[in-house]
Amino acid sequence: MKQKRFLSAVLTGAMTVMLFAGCGSNTQADTRAENTVSEQVEETEAVGGETSGALVIAEQGIFSAGGTTIVSDGEFDPENQWEETGAGQTAHVDHANVLYQIPEEETGLPMVFLHGYGQSRMGWMTTPDGREGWSDMFLRKGHSVFLIDEPHRGEAGATSVSGDISTKTLDQRWYTQFRIGRWENGQSVVNEGSQFPNDENSIDQFFRQMTPDTGMTSDMGGDFDNDVVAQALASTVDEVYERSGKDSILVTHSQGGGPGWTAAKYTDHIAAIVAIEPGGAPSSDSEDYQTVLEKNI
């Protein structure tokens, strides 16, 4: 129990000093898009330890985890496969899509990353100005990484729930929600001390990271299905255990925090949970909280 809590505390401390795109600030530096290559290397060394130059990946791939299968009534007609009723057909839906990479020298526990609202796994892989993301940093430290697109998001868009994908113009809402700064008179005004790159190309790249939901009737996340995501997340953790024989460190961000706590109900293979600015935390009398305690996470 003490070992797991110590591991969680150490990871939380290490991660706190890292810049997550749109969510970090540091009054001691103003990292700009025109950083030189040497400055980028220095930053990587300061955050993730020494870098050996080339990042060597021993294995990588993609798989789906969790989900369900829907079967329609009727009989499928192979001569009329385009008919609109879907009679007798199946739909594989509500799963997570997982990209994984295993470093050549794997020395640590595997790490499973779940993004927040409006995001996909891309947010863990790079920054808007093209620097290494958290996944590369932890690969360099000997951890295999498993990067999730949650159900109804990104490459896991197949859904059991009908809904609309919003075409509203929402870029400035995301800019404000991520607490990057203020958008005034058509201009980006970053918060004082922010390390967010304030050049035109980086802001463009940030806005293009935004990823809509399928199977949603609201662009405010009001009908987000916490349990569906938690079950897919737990299935991912179980798959990692089947492949590696190791429990996983679960890293969540923002909206992903909720499913992260709940996932502990559905798997016995979470070594630690590191929640970065979670959208909420379970109350001490909740089932999620008690489960985390009982399983010594």
Regions found by a protein language model. Give the residues of each.
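N-terminal cap/lid segment of alpha/beta-hydrolase-fold proteins
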Residues: 45-106
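Gly/Ala-rich beta-loop-alpha elbow adjacent to hydrolase catalytic centers
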Residues: 251-260
